[in-house]
Regions:
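Glycine-rich phosphate-binding loop used to anchor ATP phosphates in small-molecule kinases
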Residues: 51, 120-177, 226-243
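Conserved nucleotide-sensing/catalytic segment adjacent to the nucleotide-binding pocket
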Residues: 29, 84-86, 93-142, 158
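Conserved NTP phosphate-binding and transfer environment spanning the P-loop NTPase/kinase superfamily
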Residues: 23-28, 35, 172-326
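Hydrophobic anchor at the beta1->P-loop junction of P-loop NTPases
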Residues: 55-57
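Post-Walker A helix-loop "phosphate-sensing" segment adjacent to the P-loop in P-loop NTPases
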Residues: 74-84
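Conserved lysine of the Walker
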Residues: 65
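Charged, amphipathic alpha-helical linker segments immediately N-terminal to NTP-binding catalytic cores
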Residues: 1-40
Length: 326
C-alpha cells in the first residue's frame, strides 16, 4: 500500500491573504511543512534500514527530486547512517545512440535513453557486493566521461537513486524487493479559486519551476522550454506516471506560496513570448493566472529550501558550477 504525504487542492484566496499579511512567516511554514514530509520519509527509512538499502526516487521534471535526494542523504547521515546519492542522468546513452521520435528529434524522456544494462549492473553490484563504479555524464559533449567514481555501500548504509525512471520495472525488476524503498515525488496540488475553478494546475506549477530554472541555469529561453514541454509531458504520461502506483511513499512537493514567489520572474519570462509564437496563448493564460496572486520576494526563500533548486542560491549546489555540494 502506498503512503501519500501532502494534500490535493490549495485555495488561492487563503494563499493571497497569508502572503499579503505575513509573507516571511508564510514562507517559513511552507518550508517547515516540506521538511516534515522529508522527516517522515527518514523515519520510515530508519525503521526499515535493511529494506531501504536502495531508495529509488522517481518523479516528473521539476518536482524537486534532486534536492529531496540530497536532503535524505543529509538526514540519514545525521542519524549516523552512511548514505550516497546516485543520479540516473549519469547513465544516459551517448547522444547519437538516443532513440529518435517520428519527427527526427531525440527522445530524452524515454527510459530507453538510458544505458539500462549498465544501470542495472551498477545497482546489482551495490546490493550484492557493496561496491561499484559510477559513471559521470558530460552534457556538453553528449557522452559519459572516461573516468568513473568508486563508491562503497557497506551493510547498514543507504544509496538514494534519483531519476525520472527510478520506479520503472525495466530497472527495478531484477533488484531484490527486500532491499528497496520506492519513493515518488511530484507537485500534486492544483491552485483553485473560491468557486473550485482551477487557476494553476499542478503540471503548470512545474512548468513555472522548469522555465525559471532553464532560463537561469541551462541557457534555455522560455520559448525553447515551451517547445520541449509537450514532449516532456508526453514522456511523463508514457514512462513515469504509470509506475507511480509502485511507490511505497508518494510526496507532494508543492509549496503553497510558490506562485507568489515565482509570479514576478515568471511573468517577465513569459512576456517574452511573441504574438506570432504557437505558445503565445498558453503564455498569456499563465501570465493572467499569475497576475491574480500576491507577490513575495525571492530573497526570503531559505538557502536549504527545495525551491532554491529552481531559482538558485541553494546550499546544496556549488554557486558557479551547479554541482552538488553534499
Amino acid at each position: 500500500m502506498t503512503t501519500t504525504l501532502g494534500r490535493a487542492k490549495i485555495l488561492q484566496s487563503q494563499v493571497n491573504k497569508t502572503a499579503r499579511e505575513e509573507p516571511e512567516a508564510f514562507m517559513s511554514r511552507c518550508d517547515e511543512k516540506y521538511e516534515k514530509l522529508v522527516e517522515k520519509v527518514l523515519q520510515h527509512i530508519n525503521g526499515n534500514t535493511e529494506r531501504s538499502k536502495i531508495i529509488m526516487l522517481s518523479g516528473p521534471s521539476a518536482s524537486g527530486k534532486t534536492t529531496t535526494s540530497l536532503k535524505l542523504k543529509q538526514g540519514l547521515e545525521r542519524r549516523g547512517i552512511r548514505a550516497i546519492t546516485i543520479s540516473m542522468d549519469d547513465f544516459f546513452l551517448p547522444r547519437e545512440l538516443t532513440p529518435e521520435l517520428p519527427d527526427g528529434s531525440r527522445d530524452y524522456e524515454s527510459v530507453k535513453a538510458l544505458d539500462i544494462a549498465l544501470l542495472k549492473s551498477v545497482l546489482l553490484q551495490l546490493v550484492h557486493e557493496g561496491r561499484t563504479e559510477l559513471p559521470t555524464f558530460n552534457f556538453k559533449l553528449g557522452r559519459r566521461d572516461k573516468e568513473t567514481r568508486k563508491v562503497e555501500l557497506p551493510n547498514g548504509s543507504v544509496a538514494v537513486v534519483e531519476g525520472l525512471h527510478a520506479l520503472d520495472p525495466i530497472i527495478t525488476s531484477e533488484l531484490p524487493d527486500s532491499h528497496l524503498l520506492k519513493l515518488y515525488v511530484s507537485v500534486s496540488s492544483d491552485f483553485i479559486d473560491d468557486g473550485g475553478r482551477t487557476i494553476l494546475t499542478a503540471r503548470e506549477v512545474r512548468l513555472l519551476r522548469r522555465t525559471i530554472r532553464d532560463y537561469h541555469f541551462r541557457g534555455s529561453s522560455p520559448e525553447n522550454t515551451l517547445d520541449m514541454w509537450d514532449s516532456v509531458c508526453r514522456g511523463e504520461d508514457l514512462y513515469i506516471r504509470p509506475y507511480k502506483k509502485n511507490a511505497d511513499i508518494t510526496v507532494n512537493s508543492v509549496f503553497d506560496c510558490e506562485p507568489c514567489l515565482f509570479a514576478h520572474t515568471a511573468m517577465k519570462l513569459f512576456e517574452s513570448i511573441e504574438e506570432n509564437s504557437k505558445h503565445y496563448d498558453r503564455a498569456r493564460r499563465i501570465i493572467a493566472a499569475l497576475g491574480t496572486f500576491e507577490q513575495m520576494p525571492l530573497e526570503i526563500v531559505p538557502v536549504s529550501c527545495v525551491l532554491r533548486e529552481f531559482i538558485g542560491g541553494s546550499e546544496y549546489y556549488n554557486k558557479s558550477t551547479r554541482h552538488r555540494t553534499v
